[in-house]
Amino acid sequence: MTGVGRRSFLRGALAGTGAAAVAGLPASADSATPAAVPFHGVHQAGVTTAQQKQAIFASFDVIAVGKHELTDLFRTLTDRARLLTAGGAPAPLGITAPPADSGVLGPDMPGDDLTVTVGVGASLFDERYGLEDRKPAKLTPMKEFPDDSLDESLCHGDLSLQLCASETDTVLHALRDVARHTRGAMQLRWRVDGFRSLPRPAGTPRNLMGFKDGIVQPAPADHDKLVWVGTGNGEPAWTEGGSYQVLRQIRMLVEFWDRVSVGEQENMFGRRRDSGAPLDGSTETDRPDYAADPTGTAIPLTSHIRRANPRTAETAASQFLRRGYNYDKGTDAVGDLDMGLLFCAYQQDIARQFEAVQTRLANEPLVDYIRPVGGGYFSVLPGVRDGDDHFGRSLLG
């Protein structure tokens, strides 16, 4: 590769990326394979989509120069997401060109329930792209809470990418493909690979503390008032159909947790470890009766479920949609296990929902066994409506 060609690849890749991305598309990108999640829609897939087993959460710093290159970046992300989620065989780029695909998934890429969900951070709305007056009304950098131990290198970012699918190689393939086609326009800031455990023995899957996680979720009928952003929420018109994403990398101090009695663990969560039932119930779907237990005899007043969701009329509006994944990073520098939960939540208003809940959880007993170390707040873009649309089109005007 010549010096000019190499520099074009590393720094100015976007000049021809849009055409290359389209050239790599199968003959019919919209003809989804049987295991494909539809890409086009009012909302992005990957928010209310049935949760897949594997995930990668990645945050990027955007290094594209000017609004034109930023637009090219969003067009490229759209082309790649449309291709990857549909599956099929990529068209060859030519006999002297590099292969159109890494080949990790074989000659015919399966759809594999892959979803690609794109969000933007508050830092994108600075003077670089002239978007200062386009920032979503409720988007801020992630707040640091009293019990956090945040590592700046694991926080924030201009752009978030959530990749979810049935198999690990599918999400890894998707990340590799996106990184290849956006090189020179954005660079990885931090990344967490997640997995969702099988229900054991049934019902909601468990986190790495052994407790069922994500039992209570907003009803689909409530998504318009709890999950999706609309023009009636004081937001810019371009955000309609989007959402707010909160990501939190929560390390679990499992060596210490495993020394705690089951009874004490259950009192901290407010649920039975075996069944997931609230401590005053018998099944995981039972609704705790706080009115009948005002002093916390059955479910301690300091328990996680009681503080997170007091189930009052005043706190009903703070519910959010959870879509978290377990993670395992091996060991840290001193040999301790580095594992935990990549907490992911979607909502209409971060302050009203996630931050209100997190404030209620301050100093709960569980904080001795968990350590939030990273994450970020992102505005999830509206969906790509059709083949002529692209991510960020309404934002960029």
Located regions from the model:
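Long, histidine/aromatic-enriched segments associated with O2/redox biology
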Residues: G3, S8-L25, D30-G397
